[in-house]
Each structure stands twice: as C-alpha cells, then as structure tokens.
Amino acid sequence: MHAISQIRLTFNQDRPDHEHDDDGSAGIAVQEAKPALQAPPMYKVVLFNDDYTPMDFVVEVLEVFFNLNRELATKVMLAVHTEGRAVCGVFTRDIAETKAMQVNQYARESQHPLLCEIEKDG
C-alpha cells in the first residue's frame, strides 16, 4: 500500500490546481487512534468449607490448581475451615471459570463434596 500512496502523491504533484503542504503530504491530516485500554474484570476463585473433605485434600488442590506452596496452601485451607470460605486467587473470568471447573471436577472424581465457585472481584 505504501507504493500506491507514492503513486498517488506523484500523480497529485503533477496537477497544477492541487496545493501541497511543505512536507509534500497533499494536505492530508492523519490522526492516530489511541484505543482506550481497560483492565479486564477480575474474578475471585473461592473454596467453601464442608464437613467431609479432608484437609489434606484441600491443601493438595491448592498446591496443584493454584500453584501455592505448602505453607500458603495450609493457611488458605485453615481459612476455609475456620471462616467457611476463602479466596484461592484472583483471575480474569476465563481463567477463574476454568480453575473452578477443574477443582470441582477433581473433587467429584475423588468423591469429595468440596465446592469451588467464582465471584466478581471488587
């Protein structure tokens, strides 16, 4: 397309009735569009307490699906146990939905009633 622009400019330069700016741009004003970028909405992945899922299983889930180290996974597991729920992480919607689905599927396959859901952050 650059070659076509040069051909047009050359053609327009040959026309006596066409005025040009000093830079040879033939009076064409160009404004760059700057898109207004916004951060995507974020979602919390929340684990809920139940009376049947072993604490070790919850720690394993936090290590495997949320990449938490043993110490942090244990702290989150204790928060789930004592407060009834805890946030495992905050992600974009697609990632949060995928993680919650993976945790719920793994819990069902392991025959545990552990529940994981997402909530809009903020």
Swiss-Prot record:
InterPro entries: ClpS (IPR022935), ClpS_core (IPR003769), Ribosomal_bL12_C/ClpS-like (IPR014719). Gene3D superfamilies: 3.30.1390.10. Signal peptide: none annotated. One of its GO terms (biological process) is proteolysis. Binds to the N-terminal domain of the chaperone ClpA. Belongs to the ClpS family. NCBIfam families: PRK00033.1-2, PRK00033.1-5. Involved in the modulation of the specificity of the ClpAP-mediated ATP-dependent protein degradation. This is ATP-dependent Clp protease adapter protein ClpS. The lineage of its organism: Bacteria, Pseudomonadati, Pseudomonadota, Gammaproteobacteria, Pseudomonadales.
